[in-house]
Amino acid sequence: MLALAAGFVYLAVLSGDPVYTVYEWMSPARFQRYDRLIHIVAAEHQLDPMLVKAVVWRESRFDPEKHGSRGERGLMQVTEKAANEWARENKIADFHPDQLFDPKTNLEAGTWYLHRAVEHWKLQSDPVPFALAEYNAGASRAQRWSKNDATDTSARTFLKNVDFPATRKYVESIIDRYEFYQRRGRM
């Protein structure tokens, strides 16, 4: 029994967020409630569902009613500007930003935006850190941090250029969570 407990503690620490991991073990339904929807929406946008779930984990801890400090809404903390771009691009009439509190709408808008960012950085050998920085801080800042270099820049070099500590931590925490999901083989 002690070995089992030690194993759980080890996995919790390894996750990068032991408190969250313990909560996930104690209440798996809360943390898996949107997995099916994440799989569907991620597939529509050719993204790994584990990456999308890692973004949801970081942005809202799976709270579809979360309000951000700058007006972000829902599971993926989508901004009104990004949501309006998504609605316009997808010809969604009568879109209202409060619809972002609907998990499906939020995941569709957020995943669309993330996919667009990944596509923007597809020439990089690992576009994910670049796309996450763009998702968090905007395209112009991510471009500046890449030094406007179209050639392949390492993720490590790029992250060193990120002069917003909160954005650097944001990217690193999502990548850590994404790798955690990959290591355990499930979301």
Q: What kind of region is each of these model predictions?
A:
Residues 60-63, 82-85, 137-142:
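Solvent-exposed loop/turn segments at secondary-structure junctions
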Residues 130-187:
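Catalytic and substrate-binding regions of cell-wall glycan-acting enzymes that process beta-1,4-linked
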